[in-house]
Amino acid sequence: MAKKSIKVVVEGGNVKPGPPLAPTLSQLGLNVGEVVKKINEATSQFKGMTVPVTLDVDTDTKKYEVSVGVPTTTSLLVKKAGASGPSGDPEHKKIGNISMDDVIEVAISKKPSLTAKELKGAVKSILGTAKSIGLTVDNKDPKLVVREVEEGKYDDKIKEMEEKWSSG
């Protein structure tokens, strides 16, 4: 019973039956159209977002399982801002504004892939991504918001969400 895992990053609900996925699936003897349909169904809630997908294939029986990961931090932030994509020039061209609550929600949803041990550290990491893609947070530069987080300005808000972080 040989197993093979295929890891791909796809646009949620919009996988096409072409390269790079199709040749790999064909080599394993899988029905490309069927697999693409299953991936699109599994990722439909993340439409327009970049999502990691793992396909676990039993090469003997040709049975497979689709596992969907958490979308990228950039995708989650862009969606929260209602923007079409990250800024090519984040210092001069802002793509939108999000709230500190949005930042905390993204931090909690990304917990499995972050190295931060505490929510406060995760929030600072998400703020760094927000800055790099041209977002403001509560109408301020995320770098300033990081400083405010370090000074304790958001401690009450972060403490409120610690339970969600711990159980996640």
Curated annotation (Swiss-Prot):
Keywords carried by this UniProt record: Ribonucleoprotein, Ribosomal protein, RNA-binding, rRNA-binding
**InterPro entries attached here?**
Ribosomal_uL11 (IPR000911), Ribosomal_uL11_C (IPR020783), Ribosomal_uL11_C_sf (IPR036769), Ribosomal_uL11_CS (IPR020785), Ribosomal_uL11_N (IPR020784), Ribosomal_uL11_N_sf (IPR036796)
- The membrane spanning regions, by residue number, are none
GO BP annotations of the record are:
translation
Q: Tell me the lineage of the source organism.
A: Archaea, Thermoproteota, Thermoprotei, Sulfolobales, Sulfolobaceae
Any single GO CC term annotated in Swiss-Prot or TrEMBL for this entry: large ribosomal subunit
Can you name this protein? Large ribosomal subunit protein uL11
Q: Which family does it belong to?
A: Belongs to the universal ribosomal protein uL11 family.
PANTHER family the UniProt entry points to: 60S RIBOSOMAL PROTEIN L12, LARGE RIBOSOMAL SUBUNIT PROTEIN UL11M
Pfam families, per database record: Ribosomal_L11, Ribosomal_L11_N
Q: Which SUPFAM superfamilies match?
A: Ribosomal L11/L12e N-terminal domain, Ribosomal protein L11, C-terminal domain
Q: Which NCBIfam families match?
A: PRK01143.1
Quaternary structure, per UniProt, is:
Part of the ribosomal stalk of the 50S ribosomal subunit. Interacts with L10 and the large rRNA to form the base of the stalk. L10 forms an elongated spine to which L12 dimers bind in a sequential fashion forming a multimeric L10(L12)X complex.
PROSITE patterns, alphabetically? RIBOSOMAL_L11 (PS00359)
- Give an example GO molecular function: large ribosomal subunit rRNA binding
The function of this protein is: Forms part of the ribosomal stalk which helps the ribosome interact with GTP-bound translation factors.
